[in-house]
Amino acid sequence: GLVEVMGGSIEVTTEIGDRVKYDVINLIPPQRAGAIAVQADLVGADKRWCEVNHVTYESVKQKGIHVIGDATIGLPVPKSGTMANSMGKISASAVVHLLGGKEPPQMPPVNVCYSWVSNREAIAVINAYRIAQGKVVMIEQKLTSQNVAVAQNSEGWARSIWNDILG
């Protein structure tokens, strides 16, 4: 990691003492769950992420609080909007079941991510999961070929997920 950024001298210093000059640099801060997760004492021993039950997304530290999306750790899933959307639906179903005194169904998440690779073509990464012994397990990952049809599918997918999330 970086310990110092010297903007005027176009140089950074790393934690091991290396001084690196740059023309253009993209700095990404250390990733972690948001401040609200820290304040609610949901963050685990690593002080960065929230451990959750893989079936309900209930915090392992604070019963009755469910955590979804990028704040979670321990699941073999990408940190993507599609995954957070899937986790949200599964968690909502689990909450309804738990409030009704019923066992939540074991519903694996779903994930599809599209990436444009030219001005006309895209690829898709599709992940399939199952629940095994109370844990989310990836059973298949497929990468589509680069083509125009995938790009067209990505546009429909984007409209659908935006409508689902934003209404």
Label for each model-derived stretch:
Residues A124-G167:
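C-terminal auxiliary extensions adjacent to catalytic cores
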Residues G1-I10:
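A conserved short coil-to-beta-strand element within the FAD-binding core of flavoproteins
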Residues L2, V24-R32, V117-E121:
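Glycine-rich beta-alpha junction loops
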Residues R19-K89, H97:
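FAD-site-proximal beta/loop scaffold in flavoenzymes
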Residues R48-H66, M107, V117-M138:
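FAD-binding beta-loop-beta segment adjacent to the flavin cofactor pocket
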Residues E15-G17:
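Glycine-centered tight beta-turn/hairpin loop motif at sheet-sheet or coil-to-beta transitions
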Residues A84-P109, S115, W162:
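Internal hydrophobic alpha-helix adjacent to the cofactor/substrate pocket in enzyme cavities
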Residues A35-A37, N111-W116:
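Central beta-strand plus flanking loop segment that forms part of the substrate or channel wall
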